[in-house]
Amino acid sequence: MSEPVVDNVTNKVEKMEVKEKTSAPPKEKKEKKSNKVQLKTPKGTQDYNPRQMTIREQVFDGIKQVFKRHGAVTIETPVFELKETLTGKYGEDSKLIYDLQDQGGEICSLRYDLTVPFARYVAMNGVLNIKRYHIARVYRRDNPIMTKGRFREFYQCDFDIAGTYDLMVPDAECLVMICEILEQVKVGDFQIKLNHRKLLDAIFAICGVPADKFRAICSAVDKLDKSPWEEVRKEMVEVKALDGAVADKIEKFVSLKDEPIKLLQHLRATGMCDGNKDATEALSQLETLFGYLECFGVTQHILFDLSLARGLDYYTGIIYEAVLTGQDRVGSIAAGGRYDGLVGMYGKKDVPAVGFSIGIERIFTILEDEYKKENKKIRENATQVFVVQMEKDLIKERLAIVSELWKAGINAEFSYKVNPKLPAQLNTADESNIPLIIIIGKSEVETNSLSVKTMHDRKQVSIERSNFTVKIKEILSTIPK
């Protein structure tokens, strides 16, 4: 007897539903979210490994020697300042200042340079004269180019002379110091481009630039070291709304650059600046400065360049910028000038000042590249002696020797293993470029002596154990550095 039709259909539907259930794709497993943080430094910053830090410390030490040789003292200021302290000091570059989030207290910003904090320090503490250097980090929201030494966090090395002194004497010393520092760090041939802010303003006035456009046009001229005149002129006319004929007059001036005395004589002979009080005063000051620089013997490094503008608003006198010649890898490696009105912005009394900043990060970039090309070996530590044991069970003897070395002011290391293998100890000393090793074995213990080996020539001698540190110092003094 056949099954009822209804029952047949029901059975088929039930079977289909079962089939669909069994053939349904398995539910996707939810991927576990990773709690790992991406490890990287913020844009425009970087870590420095021991090799890099060795180079940096050597350069810093050399620069400090120059600062101290000229009688400078050092100060320290906070890494962040009240925002109002920094506002209105940097012209168009003010947009690069890092503002800190308001935490319900004072509105602060990270320092943009070391000059403005120095001026605030002088005004706040009633300082009337000081010759100071300051090496510290500064911060800028710039577009970083790490390969060219442009960062958002970087070191500056500043030197400034604040106080009322005879005309151009401190200014000349600053330029001499830049020459000494750049020769000390051995970055190659360099040139210091020099101009006078009053002369630049006089040129603008002579050419017909409206007074309210001086700073804007100055900012445009400041780009001539990176951009051709056509682009700068376009900015002046189309962006700054300067008359094209006025821009063409400016070109005749800013295209002039020559040896200091030659260009000075040319400007006077042609009468290009006649009749302008600021120009006359600036040329007189520059003549005095060039005479002092001749006495110091550094005029071969100076280029009188009327296109040099320096965009910072606080400059009032001479301005200068050092660049490397014969290569286009980095921008300026030092810059500065006179700023007689900056301190007065913070206090009742003006304190004239002049100074400069070394572009230390760019110098580091150059030196690191050169070391890589030449495959130079760099000692990452200052260890002078490595203490080695020949046989087992001499850890206490090693510790006693190292202890005496440390007490004698000698930099020393040893293996942290109780019974290290001799080849491993020698390899450590060799790879770390440690110049001297002291070897202790059972025979040395019995004879109350030590074996000493100089690594540069592989010579080995035996010395007495008693008062051995005196002999070690003698040997170290003969090793080539």
Curated annotation (Swiss-Prot):
Source organism superkingdom: Eukaryota
EC number: 6.1.1.21
GO MF assignments: ATP binding; histidine-tRNA ligase activity; RNA binding
Cellular component, GO annotation: cytosol; mitochondrion
InterPro entries assigned to the protein according to its UniProt record, in alphabetical order: aa-tRNA-synth_II, aa-tRNA-synth_II/BPL/LPL, Anticodon-bd, Anticodon-bd_dom_sf, His-tRNA-ligase, HisRS-like_core, HisRS/HisZ, HisRS_anticodon
Keywords: Aminoacyl-tRNA synthetase, ATP-binding, Cytoplasm, Ligase, Nucleotide-binding, Protein biosynthesis
Known catalytic reactions: tRNA(His) + L-histidine + ATP = L-histidyl-tRNA(His) + AMP + diphosphate + H(+)
Alphabetical GO biological process terms: histidyl-tRNA aminoacylation; mitochondrial translation
Basic and acidic residues bias (residue ranges): 12-31
Record region (Disordered): 1-48
Pfam families noted in UniProt: HGTP_anticodon (PF03129), tRNA-synt_His (PF13393)
Localization terms from the record: Cytoplasm
PANTHER family linked to this entry: HISTIDINE--TRNA LIGASE, HISTIDYL-TRNA SYNTHETASE
Protein family according to the UniProt entry: Belongs to the class-II aminoacyl-tRNA synthetase family.
Protein name as catalogued: Histidine--tRNA ligase, cytoplasmic
